[in-house]
Amino acid sequence: MIKPVLAGFLAAAAVIGAGMLAGALTHAHGHDYPEARSYAVSDDAMGDVEAALARAGENGKRVIVVMGANWCHDSRALAGWLASERIGALVDDRYELVFVNIGMPQSGDGHNLHIARRFGVDDLPGTPNLLVLSADGALLNRDTATTWRNAASREEDAIYDELAALARKAI
């Protein structure tokens, strides 16, 4: 008698546990933003930025330098938004895009921070950061460059509107 009761209890526990695990996985990976892992380590990140500035000068575009890391969900979300159909079309039309891996600057393990300093951003409080540059290297969004740490929570329209406005901003 105890064996059938124990077997029933174990079966019920397995079903409940599987349901809880499935719910946890859905919650952990179910989100309302696209994701991309675009922050590869480059041997010459500054060279990548310089090349984007040169292309921007030739093509009459601006440059977006996204400074983030693949470990960061907001960095992955921002990379995903920039590759989405609507925002990606704007970026392709108006910008040269460069992703720069910066590690974990908030914990003292930052990389390529000299790139931000070159454009007048001395402190990167976290990831990601989005620098919009003119073709001659002027930082056009000094007031918002380091405010992208909530990229996963931003709405598509808000991201699009900000990038569209920066594409038109007078220098």
What do the PLM-derived regions correspond to, one by one?
Residues 1-41:
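N-terminal targeting signals for export/organelle localization
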Residues 38-59:
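Electrostatic cytochrome c docking/interface patches
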Residues 59-72:
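Short active-site neighborhood of thiol/selenol oxidoreductases, capturing the structured segment around
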Residues 70-74, 81, 102-107, 137-139, ...:
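Solvent-exposed loop/turn segments at secondary-structure junctions
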Residues 75-90:
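Typically the conserved alpha-helix immediately C-terminal to a functionally engaged Cys/Sec
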Residues 124-171:
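Non-catalytic, surface beta->alpha helical segment in thiol-disulfide oxidoreductase systems
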